[in-house]
Amino acid sequence: MAGRFGATVVIDRPIEEVFAFLADGENDPKFSSRVLEIAKQTDGPPGVGTVYASTVKDAGMKTKREFKLTEFEVPSKIRWAEISKNLVTAPEGGYDLAPAGDGTSVAFFNVLEGHGPGALIAGLALRSARKGADAFAQAIKAAVEAS
C-alpha cells in the first residue's frame, strides 16, 4: 500500500531564503524530531544527485535512511527519493515554493510505501503522517523563521 500526505504553510521569509534552508538537508533536524542525525554524502552544493544519509526514529525504532535529490529548480521545486531499503520508505517527496506577498508558500508532500512485512504497517504510518502533516508544516515555518 502506498499513499501520499502533505500540507501547505506560508513562511514570513523571501522565497530564496526559504529555498536555501530547505535545500540543505542538514537542516532537517531543526523541524523534524524524528531525524536524529543527517549528513550530506556527496561533494558540492545541494542539487540533483545529492545524497543525504540519516538516522531516524519512528515508533521507537531507529533506522538508517538515504535520500537522493531528483529535481532541483531554484527557487521553486525540490524533489527526493529514498534509496535505502526499509519496511516503509518514501519513494517520492518534495517541496513546492511560491511567492506569497512578502513571504513564501511552501507545500510539502511525501509518498509512503510498505515493503514485505512493512506493507502491514504502512497504512498505520500513513494515517499518523497525515494526522501530523499540519503540525509538521508549522515546524518547518518556525525553523525557517528562526534561522
Model-found features: residue ranges?
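Short solvent-exposed loop/turn micro-motifs enriched in small/polar/acidic residues
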Residues: A2, K62, V88-A90
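Hydrophobic/aromatic beta-strand elements that line small-molecule binding cavities or substrate pockets
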Residues: A7-V9, R65-E71, E82, P91-P99
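Glycine-rich portal/gate segments that line the openings of hydrophobic small-molecule binding cavities
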Residues: A39-N86, S105, A135-S147
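Preference for bulky hydrophobic residues occupying beta-strand positions
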Residues: V9, S54-V56, W80, Y95, ...
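Hydrophobic ligand-binding cavity/cleft-lining segments
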Residues: M1-D43, G47
